[in-house]
A protein has these predicted regions:
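Short, polar loop motifs at secondary-structure junctions
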Residues: 61, 131-134
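Helix-adjacent hinge/juxtasegments
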Residues: 64-80
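Histidine- and aromatic-rich ligand-binding microenvironments
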Residues: 14, 48, 110-111, 132, ...
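Active-site neighborhoods of divalent-metal-dependent phosphate/nucleic-acid chemistry enzymes
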Residues: 2, 6, 76-127, 133
Length: 148
């Protein structure tokens, strides 16, 4: 039987998973907790500084609260994004904008942060845990997306 290292994987965590974890809806919070526990059981958890910055806008979430949260949960923060992440995010964002123009899409707009999160996961060869699988499957067809 192989060692844990032979099958361990890294899972990147989207902002919406952490927000769901803090949600007052026990069903949503429980689903997010179960998904995080499952991902942690398969390997390590990581997120981008983009997620950290987005979470600072959540009500009642201070910088020190977030520092403690990430330390206690063992979710590592990748504070630096490589050039390849920025380029991949830019290409995906460009494709998204072109699709919106072509279809005259009046639906919700996406922000660059979503594409940085997806590109970070793709370039790091991580799976991405999210509640928004449609966006990431469309923008990053080669990314392994896990829906909460």
């Amino acid at each position: 039987m192989g060692s844990r290292a032979a099958w361990a994987m890294t899972t990147a965590i989207d902002t919406n998973v952490i927000v769901a974890l803090w949600d007052r809806d026990p069903g949503l919070s429980s689903a997010a907790q179960s998904a995080l526990d499952g991902a942690l059981g398969r390997g390590t958890l990581v997120t981008t500084a983009t997620v950290f910055a987005e979470l600072m806008a959540a009500p009642g979430r201070s910088e020190s609260f977030l520092d403690s949260f990430f330390r206690e949960t063992g979710i590592n923060i990748d504070w630096a994004l490589e050039e390849s992440v920025w380029r991949t995010a830019g290409r995906a964002f460009q494709g998204y904008a072109a699709r919106r123009r072509k279809h005259r899409d009046a639906g919700p707009r996406r922000i660059l942060a979503n594409f940085l999160i997806g590109a970070h996961a793709l370039e790091g060869d991580y799976s991405l845990l999210t509640l928004d699988d449609h966006l990431y499957r469309t923008a990053f067809p080669h990314l392994t997306v896990v829906r909460v």
